[in-house]
Regions:
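Short beta-edge strand/loop motif at the mouth of beta-sheet-based domains
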Residues: 1-17, 24-26, 97-108
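Beta-strand residues in well-ordered beta-sheet regions across diverse protein folds
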Residues: 4, 28-30, 56-58
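Residue-identity detector for threonine
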Residues: 5, 19, 39, 53, ...
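Short, solvent-exposed loop/turn segments at secondary-structure junctions
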Residues: 10, 28, 63-65
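Short, conserved beta-turn/loop elements at beta-strand boundaries and strand-helix junctions
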Residues: 22-27, 50
Length: 112
């Protein structure tokens, strides 16, 4: 299955190829890392009890260059932010991304 997603801080569509979905257990996708190759993202979900779930995200397939290492660290920060936003949404019903970025510039409000 192919979908396209976007992010306020990185305007434009990002094509994503979903390669595997195991309900309540795992999602695997591939998307372009830049420079004409894809990375593989694996999201794993493990129940830790009635109200707790451990979520692990890994992204593999990066080339070894400073540019690609920088991109991988940027994506790591993005995945961390996404998980924090999801946790607050699930537990408190608050959308942390709403108002976080100016949709015209992709930057936090007031940033130069």
């Amino acid at each position: 299955m192919r979908i396209a997603t976007g992010f306020a801080d990185f305007p434009g569509a990002f094509p994503v190829k979903v390669t595997k979905v195991e309900p309540n257990r795992r999602i695997v996708l591939e998307w372009e890392a830049g420079e004409g190759y894809d990375t593989r993202v694996e999201m794993e979900f493990e129940s830790l009890g009635k109200d707790d779930t451990l979520v692990k995200i890994s992204e593999s397939g990066w080339r070894v260059s400073q540019k690609d290492l920088d991109r991988s660290y940027g994506n790591c920060m993005g995945w961390t932010q996404m998980l924090c936003c999801c946790k607050v949404w699930v537990e408190h019903g608050l959308n942390l991304r709403e108002g976080f970025f100016d949709t015209r510039t992709g930057k936090p409000p007031g940033a130069e």
